[in-house]
C-alpha cells in the first residue's frame, strides 16, 4: 500500500511499530532506541529493543533489534520489554531496561549497536513490593555523578556509581509533580535541570518541570505538548542536535492508517522545539501539526542500506533470510507493487550516472523505478530484478537528470503475474 501524507509530520518509523523513544546524540549521529510493539499486539506485547540512526533527522536507518528479553537470563517470560534508556560513558554503552514486574536491568556494550550483555545477572533496581519500576531515564551531570529516575505513578531517583552498573545510597521518592504520570526524561541545558514526562493518562500529553538541582525540588512548568484526543499515550525523549532542539514522543498514527480500532501498536514521532530566554519551553501542537526539517543533505555516493528512509509505509524490514542464516543487517521485504521508499534531500551534486541495487527474488521479481521529487516524478532510471532463487545479486541501470538536490523515490513495480512480495532489497548506491 503506497499511502502517504508527506505534508504532515507523520511518525518517523513506518516499517515497525515503535514506542518509548530514547534518543542519544553521539558525534554527528542521533542514535534512537525504541521499544517494539509486535504487529499483532492488542495490549502491550513487547519482546525486544530496536535501534535507528540518522544524521539529518528525517532519513532513518533501521539497525533491527539490538537487545531483547533473552539477554536477561534471569527472566523467563516472553513479554515485558518496556521503555529503555541508553547512555555512553568511558567508551561503553549502557542500556537500562525495565522488565515489567521484575525491576530494571542493565546491559552493556562496546558499541551503540551492541552486542549488549548483562553484567549483573540480576536487576539493578527492584522494589518487589510494587510494580512501579518502569521507564528509567539516566543522566550524567557535569561533575560526573550519574542519576537514574524512573516510575509510574511515583517518581523515584537513585545515584549510580561511575561503573554505571551499581547504585549509591538509597532510593529517593520525589514529591509528586503536578500532572506527572510516567515516562520521565531527565536532562540538563544551560544550567537548568529538566524533568519531562508523560502527563496524566489518558490521553497523555508531555509535561515538564525544572529545578536548580539534579535531585529537585521540581517546579512544574506546564506542557511541552498538551493532552489531545488525537493520541492516547506518550513518552518524551529530548535532545539538542546540530544547533536545534527536538522532542520525541509517540502516537497511534500509523495504526490509524489501517484501523479505527484501538490496539497498543504505537509509533515514534519527533518535532522541533524551542526554549525561551528563561529556559522555559514553548508549547508544541500535536506532532502532525509540527515541523521536522532536514538538517543537511543525504549522500547517495556510498553504500546505502535499503532500510534507510524517510517514508516506507507498507514495507517491512527483517534480518530473517529465507535462504540461510540471518543477515548481519536488516533488509527491506514484503515489497508490493506501487510501494516505495522515500529518501529526502538527496544531493546528486553535478550528476549521478548509475544506480546499483542488491536484491533477491524467488519468483518473477519486479523492478525499481528511480524517480525524483514524487512517486510519479521524473523517471531517472529503472532497475529490473529477475528471479535470483533467493540469492542476492547486484543490478545496475544508467541514470539521466539526477543532479542537484531532490527527494528520491524508489518505486517498486511488479508484473501481471506478481504484485506482492516482489523481492528483497538489501542496499543501493549511486555513481
Locate each region found by the language model.
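Carbohydrate-active catalytic/glycan-binding domains of CAZyme proteins
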Residues: 3-431
Amino acid at each position: 500500500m503506497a499511502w502517504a501524507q508527506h505534508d504532515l509530520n507523520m511518525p518517523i518509523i513506518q516499517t515497525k511499530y515503535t514506542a518509548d523513544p530514547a534518543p542519544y546524540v553521539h558525534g554527528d549521529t542521533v542514535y534512537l532506541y525504541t521499544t517494539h510493539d509486535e504487529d499483532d499486539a492488542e495490549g502491550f506485547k513487547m519482546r525486544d529493543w530496536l535501534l535507528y540512526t540518522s544524521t539529518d533527522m528525517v532519513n532513518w536507518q533501521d539497525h533491527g533489534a539490538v537487545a531483547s528479553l533473552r539477554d536477561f537470563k534471569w527472566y523467563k517470560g516472553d513479554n515485558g520489554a518496556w521503555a529503555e534508556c541508553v547512555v555512553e560513558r568511558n567508551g561503553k554503552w549502557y542500556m537500562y531496561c525495565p522488565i515489567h514486574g521484575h525491576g530494571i536491568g542493565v546491559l552493556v556494550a562496546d558499541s551503540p549497536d551492541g552486542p549488549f550483555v548483562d553484567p549483573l545477572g540480576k536487576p539493578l533496581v527492584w522494589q518487589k513490593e510494587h510494580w512501579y519500576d518502569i521507564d528509567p531515564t539516566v543522566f550524567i551531570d557535569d561533575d560526573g555523578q550519574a542519576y537514574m529516575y524512573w516510575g509510574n505513578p511515583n517518581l523515584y531517583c537513585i545515584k549510580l556509581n561511575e561503573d554505571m552498573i551499581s547504585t549509591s545510597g538509597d532510593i529517593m521518592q520525589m514529591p509528586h509533580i503536578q500532572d506527572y504520570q510516567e515516562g520521565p526524561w531527565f536532562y540538563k541545558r544551560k544550567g537548568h535541570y529538566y524533568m519531562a514526562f508523560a502527563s496524566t493518562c489518558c490521553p497523555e500529553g508531555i509535561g515538564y518541570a525544572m529545578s536548580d538541582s539534579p535531585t529537585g525540588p521540581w517546579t512544574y512548568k506546564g506542557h511541552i505538548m498538551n493532552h489531545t484526543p488525537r493520541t492516547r499515550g506518550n513518552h518524551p525523549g529530548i535532545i539538542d542536535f546540530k544547533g536545534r532542539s527536538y522532542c520525541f514522543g509517540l502516537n497511534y498514527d500509523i495504526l490509524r492508517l489501517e484501523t479505527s480500532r484501538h490496539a497498543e501498536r504505537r509509533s515514534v514521532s519527533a518535532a522541533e522545539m524551542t526554549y525561551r530566554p528563561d529556559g522555559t519551553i514553548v508549547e508544541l501542537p500535536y506532532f502532525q501539526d509540527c515541523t521536522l526539517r532536514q538538517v543537511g543533505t543525504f549522500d547517495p555516493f556510498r553504500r546505502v542500506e535499503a532500510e534507510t528512509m524517510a517514508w516506507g509505509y507498507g514495507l517491512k524490514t527483517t534480518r530473517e533470510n529465507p535462504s540461510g542464516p540471518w543477515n548481519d543487517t536488516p533488509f527491506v521485504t514484503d515489497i508490493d507493487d506501487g510501494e516505495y521508499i522515500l529518501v529526502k534531500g538527496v544531493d546528486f551534486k553535478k550528476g549521478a550516472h548509475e544506480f546499483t541495487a542488491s536484491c533477491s527474488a524467488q519468483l518473477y521479481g519486479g523492478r525499481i523505478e528511480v524517480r525524483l521529487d514524487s512517486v510519479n516524478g521524473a523517471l531517472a532510471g529503472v532497475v529490473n530484478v529477475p528471479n535470483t532463487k533467493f540469492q542476492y545479486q547486484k543490478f545496475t541501470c544508467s541514470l539521466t537528470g539526477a543532479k542537484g538536490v531532490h527527494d528520491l523515490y524508489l518505486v517498486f513495480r511488479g508484473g501481471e503475474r506478481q504484485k506482492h512480495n516482489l523481492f528483497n532489497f538489501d542496499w543501493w548506491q549511486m555513481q
